[in-house]
């Protein structure tokens, strides 16, 4: 049985669109590549055939992964997210306790929707794990590969 996957409606739709593309476009393209490579004769030393088979394997694995995630997905409605503590889909403003001038803002999302460029971090990341369950005023020590980071939760909200 798969772990429950928590997604926004947009995140769910993105995964669904990717699955549709893989099933109806990519899969057919890969099968064409395999057929073309087969037509070149001896498969034992056919790098084109090997590459196409590898692409097929990766495509089928991604299809299986997406089907599993979508079948176990729970779509979260931001309107029903509490802001008394840091939960998935909450945004949090942090004050850097080592440099009182620096503030950071993150939105906690599932690993399927994380995008550090947009400030969306996974609840499974070191930062996400450290923040889950914290309330405004709580101090947080986050252990990252570069060492320890010290923050205070200043604000919790939903975008």
UniProtKB/Swiss-Prot annotation:
Organism of origin is Chlorobium phaeovibrioides (strain DSM 265 / 1930) (Prosthecochloris vibrioformis (strain DSM 265))
Record gene name: greA
Could you provide one GO biological process annotation from this protein's UniProt record? DNA-templated transcription elongation
Instruction: Decide whether keyword DNA-binding is in the record.
Output: yes
Pfam families with a match to the protein in the record: GreA_GreB, GreA_GreB_N
Write out the similarity annotation.
Belongs to the GreA/GreB family.
The molecular function terms in GO held by this entry are: DNA binding; RNA polymerase binding
Coiled-coil segments on the chain, per record: 44-75
Q: Does Coiled coil count among this protein's keywords?
A: yes
Q: What name does this protein carry?
A: Transcription elongation factor GreA
Could you list this entry's UniProt keywords, alphabetically sorted: Coiled coil, DNA-binding, Transcription, Transcription regulation
UniProt signal peptide: none
Q: Which Gene3D superfamilies match?
A: Transcription elongation factor, GreA/GreB, C-terminal domain, Transcription elongation factor, GreA/GreB, N-terminal domain
Function, please?
Answer: Necessary for efficient RNA polymerase transcription elongation past template-encoded arresting sites. The arresting sites in DNA have the property of trapping a certain fraction of elongating RNA polymerases that pass through, resulting in locked ternary complexes. Cleavage of the nascent transcript by cleavage factors such as GreA or GreB allows the resumption of elongation from the new 3'terminus. GreA releases sequences of 2 to 3 nucleotides.
Q: Which NCBIfam families match?
A: greA, PRK00226.1-2, PRK00226.1-4
Q: Which InterPro entries match?
A: GreA/GreB_C_sf, TF_GreA/GreB_CS, Tscrpt_elong_fac_GreA, Tscrpt_elong_fac_GreA/B, Tscrpt_elong_fac_GreA/B_C, Tscrpt_elong_fac_GreA/B_fam, Tscrpt_elong_fac_GreA/B_N, Tscrpt_elong_fac_GreA/B_N_sf
């Amino acid at each position: 049985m798969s772990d429950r996957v928590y997604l926004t409606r947009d995140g769910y739709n993105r995964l669904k669109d990717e699955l549709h593309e893989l099933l109806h476009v990519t899969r057919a393209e890969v099968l064409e590549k395999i057929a073309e490579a087969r037509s070149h004769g001896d498969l034992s030393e056919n790098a084109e055939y090997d590459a196409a088979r590898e692409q097929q394997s990766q495509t089928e694995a991604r299809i299986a992964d997406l089907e599993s995630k979508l079948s176990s997905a729970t779509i979260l409605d931001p309107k029903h997210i509490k802001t008394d503590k840091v939960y998935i889909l909450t945004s949090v403003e942090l004050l850097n306790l080592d440099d009182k001038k620096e503030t950071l803002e993150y939105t906690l999302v599932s690993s399927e929707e994380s995008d550090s460029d947009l400030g969306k971090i996974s609840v499974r990341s070191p930062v996400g794990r450290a923040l889950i369950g914290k309330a405004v005023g709580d101090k947080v020590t986050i252990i990252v590969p570069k060492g320890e980071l010290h923050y205070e939760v200043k604000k919790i909200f939903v975008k």
